[in-house]
Amino acid sequence: MSDLLSRTHAIALDAADPLRPLRNEFLIPRHGGGEQTYFVGNSLGLQPRGAQAAVQEVMKQWGELAVEGHFTGPTQWLSYHRLVSAQLARVVGALPSEVVAMNTLSVNLHLMMVSFYRPTAQRPVILMEAGAFPTDRHAVEAQIRFHGFDPAECLVEVQPDEANGTISLTAIERAIAEHGPRLALVLWPGVQYRTGQAFDLDAITRAARLQGARIGFDLAHSVGNLPLRLHDVAPDFAVWCHYKYLNSGPGAVAGAFVHERHHRDTTLPRFAGWWGHEEATRFQMAPQFTPAIGAEGWQLSNPPILGLAPLRASLDLFERAGMEALRSKSLALTGMLEALVRARLSGVLDIITPAEPQRRGCQLSLRVIGGRERGRALFEHLRGIGVLGDWREPDVIRISPTPLYNRYLDVHHFVEEVEAWAGL
């Protein structure tokens, strides 16, 4: 085995890692007498140490100011959601006016489709990937039915055409072109949740717009994982959650993007609520709705301040690190994991995530050779010894080395434990 795949080399890489201090900014779950080896940042990110202080700041302000906290104090709640806008915009490559933290992903997806899925008899079709995360498919079917159409006729799913269940860009572009005259909306993920495949958002956007279709992205597994350029790529909308790579806690407030070309479009339908009304006249309580300019205009209710506080703490860490530095470390971490699996576990694990670094984020999806029961046995064994990935039916273990807090030694430890389990 190459020295570059040795435990000694992993320790040396950790010692030289410029992002190493950021691990200390997180609470690492305990296991036995030590720390858990945690590879589930793609499902629920670890708690930033600053999250509790951020929440306590809000609690203190509530206790001391009560309702006046909306308008006074160091972080008045009237504009609290804007405290995250600039940092969040840098994470997703957008203008601050194009992003808003609000609701949850499924709610935001429905709100965006109210505005950007406008089917007609000639253009009723939504195109998405086969095997999409269930909430996306549920929402799409519900929207199609809401407009009086039949999902059996108006939902097109692009099937995998590559080994291991991934989808080529050629297949996506071909499907968009084939259904183009009937396409109302293309809804696509930035990263496919089960396979870990990352997609070329530029190319998909171009293909959709060439056919006159709207384009939106579910970036649940992309935000905080991959550098994004939403303003330049210019989809109509995007939605995502903040509890994965953005480390904002279970059920965290989610995020949405609306490109600036739509900000002053008064013909665009939307579901309205009072917090989406322009701030200057909101408290005049007029019956007419005047939307705020920007993504803020899609807000409904006043934001949950206690839910936004942990997001502030996490975004501060992203500011310290920078997305390019995080991506650089992520490539190295996941590259080491791939190399070790291929060198030492080729008879135990199959990697179903694309091998090309530009076609994946930090996640590797692994299928245990020997079938589902053997795979589940390995997953439970690893969990029992404090090495935590996650399981996705029917037979995939997802391992996601997250550069904010995972180490090269964590990757090496995972491979050693699988070797021991397999008796290698």
Curated annotation (Swiss-Prot):
Q: What is its EC number?
A: 3.7.1.3
Q: Which domain of life is it from?
A: Bacteria
Modified-residue entries (N6-(pyridoxal phosphate)lysine), positions: K244
Q: Which residues bind pyridoxal 5'-phosphate?
A: L105, S106, F133, P134, T135, D136, D218, H221, Y243, W274, N302
One Pfam family per UniProt: KYNU_C
Record-linked InterPro entries: Kynureninase (IPR010111), PyrdxlP-dep_Trfase (IPR015424), PyrdxlP-dep_Trfase_major (IPR015421), PyrdxlP-dep_Trfase_small (IPR015422)
Q: In which pathway does it act?
A: Amino-acid degradation; L-kynurenine degradation; L-alanine and anthranilate from L-kynurenine: step 1/1; Cofactor biosynthesis; NAD(+) biosynthesis; quinolinate from L-kynurenine: step 2/3
Q: Which cofactor does it need?
A: pyridoxal 5'-phosphate
Q: What keywords would UniProt list here?
A: Hydrolase, Pyridine nucleotide biosynthesis, Pyridoxal phosphate
Q: Which SUPFAM superfamilies match?
A: PLP-dependent transferases
Under the subunit heading, UniProt states: Homodimer.
This molecule's function is given as:
Catalyzes the cleavage of L-kynurenine (L-Kyn) and L-3-hydroxykynurenine (L-3OHKyn) into anthranilic acid (AA) and 3-hydroxyanthranilic acid (3-OHAA), respectively.
Q: State the protein's name.
A: Kynureninase
Q: Which organism is it from?
A: Stenotrophomonas maltophilia (strain K279a)
Q: What high-level taxonomic lineage is stated for the organism? A: Bacteria, Pseudomonadati, Pseudomonadota, Gammaproteobacteria, Lysobacterales
